[in-house]
Amino acid sequence: MSSAAELSPTPFGRLLTAMVTPFDADGCVDLALAGRLARYLVDEGSDGLVVCGTTGESPTLSWQEQHQLLGVVRQAVGPGVKVLAGTGSNSTAEAIEATTQAAAVGADGALVVVPYYNKPPQEGLEAHFRAIAQAAPELPLMLYNIPGRTGCSLAPATVARLMECPNVVSFKAASGTTDEVTQLRLQCGSKLAVYSGDDGLLLPMLSVGAVGVVSVASHLVGRRLKAMIEAYLNGQGALALSYHEQLQPLFKALFVTTNPIPVKAALELSGWPVGSPRLPLLPLDPVMRDALSNTLTALCQT
């Protein structure tokens, strides 16, 4: 086991589910189903839930819908489960307002994505995150780097400076490379809890110092992901690797097109009527849906 995994804190546990947002037949947020899904995910091994992140379709939810959903999930899972709110925006003022509101609703933390579209320089990113941290000093923050969606990347050196803010405690690494974890470790040491933002890279990232994952696949295989993490942490590398290899077909199937299109289809196929994504996202096309169904069937047999 990596010494980094031993030394780094785990402020939100090790397995967090980036929760989908259920919609009813009219396209409205299905709050009752969201509460049931949240409880199910916890029962299946999630230490915490991320509400209204990328997988939760935050770009097409109003802030009112997001705050309502957060409140319902918070109440559904009770105080023993970590609930993080996606509060990022490319407007610093909006992100501050969303983050302070999330704290008031009862979030245990905020997932704050790098500002998208306007592509700030590193100095602007630092000022943006510092302003959010200072506006909600009691709320732990998880910085979220996903350059494939945002168009810019938060540099490890910038993260190191932001750790002057006591509530900057964690980082979701979704750049698609394990080197991001290594560079964060070199710049920030072991105090920063780095979470993989990619199910397929969870095991490699654990080996270089990540502490866990913000997962999409845990909607479907939470217990297996938890078992893989525990096997790695207990020094059972071969067992962890067997889980990693067993789950690869599902990891790939869930990203055959834009997230959360496939995972919502997978949940529908598994008996959870979470509805289609909101436009401009579309339901999974029939050919991909059939392939996904076959993947799920095969997984049930292993």
Swiss-Prot record:
Main location: cytoplasm
EC number: 4.3.3.7
Pathway(s) served: Amino-acid biosynthesis; L-lysine biosynthesis via DAP pathway; (S)-tetrahydrodipicolinate from L-aspartate: step 3/4
PROSITE patterns: DHDPS_1, DHDPS_2
Keyword Lyase in record: yes
Residues the record marks as active site: Y144 (proton donor/acceptor), K172 (schiff-base intermediate with substrate)
GO cellular-component term (any): cytosol
Biological process terms in GO annotation: diaminopimelate biosynthetic process; lysine biosynthetic process via diaminopimelate
Keywords in alphabetical order: Amino-acid biosynthesis, Cytoplasm, Diaminopimelate biosynthesis, Lyase, Lysine biosynthesis, Schiff base
Binding site for pyruvate: T55, V214
Pfam families assigned to the protein according to its UniProt record, in alphabetical order: DHDPS (PF00701)
Record site feature (Part of a proton relay during catalysis), residues: T54, Y117
Subcellular location, record wording: Cytoplasm
Primary enzyme class: lyase
GO molecular function, one term: 4-hydroxy-tetrahydrodipicolinate synthase activity
Function statement: Catalyzes the condensation of (S)-aspartate-beta-semialdehyde [(S)-ASA] and pyruvate to 4-hydroxy-tetrahydrodipicolinate (HTPA).
Similarity comment: family membership: Belongs to the DapA family.
Subunit record text: Homotetramer; dimer of dimers.
NCBIfam families: dapA
PANTHER family: 4-HYDROXY-2-OXOGLUTARATE ALDOLASE, MITOCHONDRIAL, DIHYDRODIPICOLINATE SYNTHASE
Protein name: 4-hydroxy-tetrahydrodipicolinate synthase
Organism: Prochlorococcus marinus (strain MIT 9313)
Gene name linked to the record: dapA
